[in-house]
Amino acid sequence: MEHSRFLSGLILAAFLSRVSPYEVEMEELEDKVFVSCNTSIIWLQGTEGELLSDKKIDLGKRILDPRGLYKCNAPKEQDSNSKIFLQVYYRMCQNCVELDSATLAGIIVTDIIATLLLALGVYCFAGHEMGRFSRAADTQDLLRNDQLYQPLRDRNDGQYSRLGENWARNK
């Protein structure tokens, strides 16, 4: 995970961008995270970790997202009130997939193949007629060329012609 090392280095560089007598170092060995200071390091809050020496603390496995607030005391030749606070926020992506060019090309090729197979399946099932229809069903004259509307079939409309007899019609 090159990105996680880069991200943790970037976080440390942001905190330690000014010149200071402190030397804070963050290490990743195998799957563990270590923070060391050139002076004594003290846990304040968050992941307590295991104190390996007065200057180095083991924060545990990086997959468990160690985070916390730590303090480096001043070197003996410096002012004893001078302290540096170090905030560690370690975040690992456990369900991520690295997307490089080969993976992306594989996804695109698989998508094209699946689309072609789907088109072939639709063509095979819908492209061929199962039976031949009669010639009369193929051509049907609905209206003659000179006719605008189709004539109504024979019907008894006597009941409808009596509905509005008493109403005045506007013509």
UniProtKB/Swiss-Prot annotation:
It is found in: Cell membrane. This is T-cell surface glycoprotein CD3 delta chain. It comes from the Eukaryota. Residues 22-104 are extracellular. It comes from Sus scrofa. Disulfide bonds join C37-C72. PANTHER family: T-CELL SURFACE GLYCOPROTEIN CD3 DELTA CHAIN, T-CELL SURFACE GLYCOPROTEIN CD3 GAMMA CHAIN / DELTA CHAIN. Residues 138-166 form the ITAM domain. The TCR-CD3 complex is composed of a CD3D/CD3E and a CD3G/CD3E heterodimers that preferentially associate with TCRalpha and TCRbeta, respectively, to form TCRalpha/CD3E/CD3G and TCRbeta/CD3G/CD3E trimers. In turn, the hexamer interacts with CD3Z homodimer to form the TCR-CD3 complex. Alternatively, TCRalpha and TCRbeta can be replaced by TCRgamma and TCRdelta. Interacts with coreceptors CD4 and CD8.
